[in-house]
UniProtKB/Swiss-Prot annotation:
UniProt-listed CDD domains: GT_MraY
Annotated protein name in UniProt: Phospho-N-acetylmuramoyl-pentapeptide-transferase
Species this protein is from: Buchnera aphidicola subsp. Acyrthosiphon pisum (strain APS) (Acyrthosiphon pisum symbiotic bacterium)
Necessary cofactors: Mg(2+)
Associated pathway: Cell wall biogenesis; peptidoglycan biosynthesis
Amino acid sequence: MLIFFNKYLHINLNILSYIPYRAIFSLLTSFFINLYIGPYFIYYFKKLQTYQIIRNNGPKTHYSKKNTPTMGGIFIIFSILFSTILYCNLSNIYIWYVISILIGYGLIGFIDDYKKIKYKNSQGLKLKWKYFFLSIIAFIFICMIKINNKDIISTELIIPFCIKNDFEINYLYIFLSYFVLVGTSNAVNLTDGLDGLAIMPVIFLTCGLTLISLFSDNINISHYLHVQYVKNSTELAILCMAIVGSGLGFLWFNSYPAKVFMGDVGSLALGGSLGAIAILLHQELLLIIMGGIFVFETISVILQIISFKIRKKRIFQMAPVHHHYEVKGILEPLIIVRFWIVSLILLLISLISLKVC
């Protein structure tokens, strides 16, 4: 929006023409918005009794969280949208693709949270309907970018740590994009089980995508680093920084002991947005490395289900795996910080892959 005012109202704020400045302003704006509105949202959430529903079969340490409000993802989404609309060039179609996923997946998460709170159970939206709506939005997203800009979704798969890192997979790419969107949103959702556990890996991952969006828009740098050239992708860096700032602002209230949880409205929206950005940048496989914590959590659930159905035995004492460590007696803050450390290391490994060959 500021770009529009600067161009057509002749305000002549040259600083707005520089991506790094707008990215920094975007981060700071979303951060301070959350710091300011966070306490108000938490107050009204408590007043409306939007408390987190605790599973009866969950870790006993979680019973102390039963009076902690959820749905904090609402003010995460608000601050991201505010900063994005304020600082991004809104004529850039990539921005609208990500915003559509942010709002669409956020709405599904909101309905899920609302049903949990209303009916006082941890089930919420039925699983089949949840995946149905997530899938519908994912396919609409894929079809729209395929129709409007065929260059965004080429059918080449970029494989990290390979000398020849682009492989033609034809229309399998559409299904890969679908699984990235739906999978990432649910992976973040599964990880969001401890205070601050999910939001910091989201921040790290978004920082990595920020760098790639900057590299991808320069044909010489992208060729040197073996990343896909994506024209005008630098605007995504501003949106990414809005996510980082919003995440840091939310962490202010979500760090142990949490005053608010993001809920499904936040985790599905953030996970879906990261998946969408990775698709636009052609970094679907690199996303798996960057978001290795989310992959680990998801695999732990899948293995637990398969093992119990086939062997009638559990691999972990409880899944997702962060609950396994809780049951083993490891303190929650230790689990959280250690997962953060692993997430940071995975980010660094993924960045090394850009010029490993």
